[in-house]
Regions:
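Nucleotide and nucleotide-moiety/phosphate-recognizing core
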Residues: 2-164, 169-185, 193, 203
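Short, charged, intrinsically disordered terminal tails
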Residues: 197-200
């Protein structure tokens, strides 16, 4: 997939990986490749309008990827999305792919998120998948930058801040299309069992 000039990306770095013994999720290696390198590698190939990783200074970001962080840190994924969108500074009509760094199966969803084009009344498209029951994956989606900016500003106006606010609570108000993906595509990494599952698939 050639990079599209109308597509940008935000990679949300995730928390401290408490259930993984405090490991830095972006630096977790699967198949000899760090998660941040694997995920950003997919996005850089598709997103010509820029890619930003919301990660602390301790994480080395791949070449061609910007870095930002919510202030203060550890504000949760919605605060990370807000920081990432501000760092990108893209026009309202740009499409912004939003993903978590612990999504090594991302390559299986990006084409379905970007094609076909969004409908005229749609504000974005998210993946639906999971095990045992599929559910909306707001951290595996593409959003119109203007709609994302508006809904975040509305949340700040209503709540005072998006720090610690759930992603689903805010983004579900958008007019979103949904595309089904295999459960494996959106399996994230929260536990040692998840790490072992991905290592069996990709190697250590």
């Amino acid at each position: 997939m050639a990079p599209r000039a109308d597509v940008a990306a935000i990679v949300v770095g995730g928390g401290g990986g408490e259930r993984l013994g405090g490991v830095s999720k972006p630096d977790l290696t699967l198949g000899g490749v760090r998660l941040i390198d694997r995920v950003c590698g997919v996005l850089v190939e598709a997103c010509g309008a820029g890619c930003v990783a919301v990660v602390p200074p301790s994480v080395r970001v791949p070449e061609g990827v910007m870095r930002t962080l919510e202030d203060p840190p550890s504000g949760g994924p919605l605060a990370g999305i807000d920081a990432g969108l501000r760092a990108l500074g893209v026009d309202d009509d740009v499409l912004v792919v939003v993903v978590s760094v612990d999504a090594p199966g991302l390559a299986g969803s990006v084409p379905a998120l970007l094609d076909p084009p969004l409908g005229p009344d749609s504000e974005g498209r998210i993946a639906v998948g999971g095990d045992p029951e599929p559910f909306d994956q707001y951290l595996m989606g593409v959003y119109r930058a203007g709609a994302l900016r508006r809904i975040l500003d509305e949340a700040v106006a209503a709540l005072g801040s998006v720090r610690g606010v759930g992603v689903r609570r805010v983004l579900r108000a958008l007019a979103l299309e949904r595309v089904s993906v295999d459960a494996d595509v959106c399996r994230d990494i929260d536990t040692p069992e998840d790490v072992a599952w991905w290592q069996d698939l990709l190697g250590k």
